[in-house]
A protein has these predicted regions:
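Membrane-interface elements of multi-pass transporters and channels
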Residues: 37, 41, 45, 57-64, ...
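Juxtamembrane/interface alpha-helical elements of multi-pass membrane proteins
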Residues: 72-186
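Membrane-helix interfacial "entry" motifs
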Residues: 13, 36, 59-64, 96, ...
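Transmembrane alpha-helix interface motif
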Residues: 1-41, 47-56, 144, 148-151, ...
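Alpha-helical transmembrane segments and their membrane-interface exit regions
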Residues: 50-60, 74-78
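Alpha-helical transmembrane segments and their helix-start/interface "positive-inside/aromatic belt" motifs
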Residues: 24, 63-73, 248
Length: 265
């Protein structure tokens, strides 16, 4: 749990920190499209190169981002292995009992693995360089045109901000509860898989209780400050779109064009 870094903001003055959060979000959406386009070795290598350049520009150690993968390693491994054996087309490379994996299954599993790594890296870059409040403002600004069809842009942005804000808090609460259970003699790594799952049940009840308590305290605090929704609200800092934001978005579009060329070339 200590390896969970997604949702944590790290203050800094890098060029990525200075970019408008609207541009970062738009780039995130474009990057997701790129992940589905990247279906061969060349395109995935290009995306990894692009991600490592972004990591360097954030002035945050690459090892920090790699550390964040540890909390997701089980999901990544399970999905990759499932994809490996779920694809039956292609030449059979190995078979045992009714399990078999093929060259196409291996290729698909590698692509799924790369997609997981890339999306986690990019999401982490977004959250460590952008405050939750800025992300909420960006979501609200992007969704503002949809207000004409009654889409609650402000409320969606507020929910996103609160969700990102409380991810590190929930992780810290989980660590605190697990340490308290260990002090009472609980071993979370002992026994078979079913026993290990059962050992986590005593964590869930106090974690849920703590979450509801925090949510109730937050609701009371918002009511005490007269919060009544987004209508008529002003901001202390307004978002400013600059030349570097346009340039950054243009670079992402160029990478998208190059991916499309390599995919169909």
């Amino acid at each position: 749990m200590n390896n969970m870094i997604l949702g944590r903001y790290i203050p800094g003055n890098s060029i990525i920190h200075q970019l408008d959060p609207r541009g970062k979000l738009l780039s995130m959406f474009l990057f997701i499209f790129l992940l589905f386009w990247a279906n061969n070795l060349q395109t995935n290598l290009l995306l990894f190169g692009f991600i490592f350049v972004l990591m360097y520009l954030t002035r945050i150690s690459v090892s920090f981002y790699v550390k964040g993968l540890k909390s997701m390693i089980f999901i990544i491994a399970f999905t990759t292995i499932f994809q490996l054996f779920a694809t039956s087309q292609g030449t059979i490379l190995y078979q045992w009992w009714f399990f078999k994996f093929t060259d196409q299954g291996l290729a698909q599993a590698a692509i799924i693995f790369c997609r997981f790594i890339l999306i986690i890296f990019y999401s982490t870059i977004l959250t460590v360089t952008t405050t939750p409040l800025s992300l909420a403002d960006a979501v609200e600004k992007i969704l503002t045109p949809l207000k004409i069809i009654k889409v609650p842009a402000h409320e969606i942005g507020l929910m996103l901000s609160m969700s990102l804000r409380f991810v590190p808090t929930l992780v810290d609460d989980t660590n605190r509860i697990m340490n308290a259970q260990r002090a009472r003699g609980v071993d979370f790594g002992e026994g078979n898989l079913l026993k290990r799952i059962r050992s986590f049940i005593p964590i869930l009840i106090p974690l849920f209780a703590s979450s509801f308590k925090r949510a109730d305290a937050l609701a009371i605090a918002m009511e005490a400050r007269g919060y009544k929704g987004g209508e008529g609200r002003t901001r202390y800092r307004s978002l400013q779109w600059g030349v570097k934001d346009t340039l950054a978005l243009f670079i992402v579009l160029c990478v998208m064009g190059l991916i499309f060329y390599l995919k169909n070339g």
